[in-house]
């Protein structure tokens, strides 16, 4: 039993010091959460809104930096899964999951993204970029997420403890993993038999750990084959089974975290997707020594896999290369692009010896024979279950159309399926498919994922895989179970191999996506072979190994190969494209027309013409073997050679005739008409011969089918590739004819269906139009009835509600009249206030005019005083400067007195002038005050007048509206509108009243004060004088 079942603690609580261990039992979290139900019950420990960079964003590209980030709600669970969804509702399915148990580091992403508060979560699969709104949020997330890479790095340094094996019999999964680990790891101190996987998560981790251990020391290429060790069991496994395991091994080599990885999606298998492999191969360092394409083991695997390709042609969808003469051109490209790189690791482990001589130079290498015999000797020692072992998740369709996911295990000519891998350990079988009765496995289009069907005598079983690569691997593996490969008898196939080495044609491998980019830089010869493959991509993309090529293309390919020079040391030219053949034919027709135009004489038909018709371009035939008697294969070769060369007469004998005729010494020449008739006869004869040859071809095809049927049951030698190709070409012709018949029948059915569809559509359109017209008429009648009914109901309701409306209108009229009276009263008050303000304004204006008059008087008086002062000053000056003799004779006392009086008088005049200035300034201030008062009064008057005008207009509108409502009400009641009901307007002139007060007190007081002041000043001046 697994450790997870023995663990009584089912609830994981992180330890304070080690987050990957349980607080209760101190066991890893993988031993607690075993199924999806436990995953959904996990407790969230942190969450919040974050911004996620879109998938596939390359921040090194400036265009991608402007992409809009996606706002998602992130939740971190206690088992280490970071999930994000569109909202925070717990019922919302997450859009994605980041397994923090595989996280290698969490770093600041501002340098990469150019965005503040961003983080980069590094995992072996990809990089995830998240961003927060503030620094506090991103700091909290960084603190929570950094626990996982730190724990992973700590666990990397610790050596894992492996549980001892249980005494029960190990299942197929255990046998496969232990055997592969024992063959691939020789330097490990822990015995590989003890590495028994316990659960779904530990199985994957143990598989990766066994792949992580270093391989055996590779032998140098210079060592002889006798010194090399026999290949291990893992190296003898089929390439289709081994490729996925090596891919997972390569990915485990590059994993930074050493803790056990838990599969979150529940889909556990030894396969990986193409995207994962592509990313891993970019990180994988180049191999130390590339394998030589001409090693014996490589050639042995090529020849053996040709038998597999013949048996599982519909499943593999590819074409294998024959053993070519050139060592650089016979490199097998593999059955899919994903195996190109892992196969190199196989060859490095198998220690390739020195390169062998060319296959065309020597019929068969002794090393090759030794390797084949070595394989025969080592294969029985290998457990068949290990060679054919495969397991993984697939979905099965039941009879009711329901799909259910199962854990499938392929071994011992049966395909068993369980509920999950734990059920496999417990031998809890859900069902089994017997592959001994299986005769075919084909791809089948389904709605879910990538489907395929297993055809057995009992029935058909429909399954589906997650990816096309997984489906292809399953089909290939199942087909190998259906048609197991047997080691050929090398001794009995030596002469046939000689024939094959001299006349083999180069077939076209199936092109794979991005294969050339992954294989590194090839040598120049390999580049040329790839260029030939790229020229053939037009055909190879259209036709696979299971999709037969048309027989015309096969004949054209072999014809082009036969016409060329018979050089067996070079691969023959690939088949010409249809466009090139058309251009060649058009060119020949043009040359024929020109040469016929040059013929101006006729030449009688004779023996030369008969000999001429027999001149054809013959390509060198296939060399016959003198070592064996003529068997069925030799006869087929001869017949095919006749079929290949016969269609060339029709095109190639015509250009020879003008050349031959032009070499005549000016004799009689054929006319154009006679030459045309001869050519037509010759064409008919050629067609007759071609029909006879086609009949013979059909007979030979029947013989070939019988021979292939005999050889299928007990095949002990190599099969000539050219023979197989021709057999497939014949089957391809019949298949093409059937397809054409089916297409024509399908086209006829489509035309019938289109006509039926058009007829039904026309009938349906006519019926729809008539139904629409009937519905329109019915709708119109119904509308008319509804309108009459509604009018009657409205009239009755109006008659019943007229009295109520009349009372309501009267009440509203009375209320409006009351409001109007209130408004008129307010209006009269406003008018009265306006009149008072107007009177006050008039009084202010009068006071202003009075002030202006007083100001003028004061200005005149001031002018008079100034004049008097000037006269007095001049008089004083004349007194001071008038009589010099009098001054000399006068007494000093009189002079001093006069000077004092003059000073006093001058001071008095100055003080009077100062007072007058003050008076003028005070008058100016009063004038400005009066002007401000006037402006304020006029503004207030305007505002009040505007308000009164608005109120009057509003009242008039209300009165007119109420009159109209009243008139409408009286008309509805059937009464005449009351002419006497008129509301008298308010006369603004009537409300004006002359006020009996005037603001004259202030002006009188100021005027009296001014008079008093002016009198006192005049008296003082007169006294001083």
Swiss-Prot record:
Residue span of region Interaction with F-actin: 2-383
Subunit comment: Binds F-actin through its N-terminus. Interacts with MYZAP. Binds RHOA, PPP1R12A/MBS and PPP1R12C/MBS85 through adjacent coiled coil domains.
Entries under InterPro entries matching the protein: Actin_Cytoskeleton_Reg (IPR052223), M-RIP_PH (IPR039597), PH-like_dom_sf (IPR011993), PH_domain (IPR001849)
Region: Interaction with PPP1R12A, residue numbers: 824-879
Gene3D superfamilies: Pleckstrin-homology domain (PH domain)/Phosphotyrosine-binding domain (PTB) (2.30.29.30)
Keyword set, alphabetical order: Actin-binding, Coiled coil, Cytoplasm, Cytoskeleton, Phosphoprotein, Repeat
Coiled coil (UniProt feature): 673-977
Region (Disordered): 152-302, 317-383, 485-545, 560-591
Lineage: Eukaryota, Metazoa, Chordata, Craniata, Vertebrata
Domain PH span(s) in chain numbering: 43-150, 387-483
Gene Ontology CC terms, in alphabetical order: actin cytoskeleton; cytosol; focal adhesion
Its job: Targets myosin phosphatase to the actin cytoskeleton. Required for the regulation of the actin cytoskeleton by RhoA and ROCK1. Depletion leads to an increased number of stress fibers in smooth muscle cells through stabilization of actin fibers by phosphorylated myosin. Overexpression of MRIP as well as its F-actin-binding region leads to disassembly of stress fibers in neuronal cells.
Official protein name in the record: Myosin phosphatase Rho-interacting protein
Positions of region (Interaction with RHOA): 546-824
Compositional bias of kind Pro residues: 284-294
Top-rank lineage group of the source organism: Eukaryota
Residues bearing the modification Phosphothreonine: 295, 348, 646
Organism, scientific name: Homo sapiens
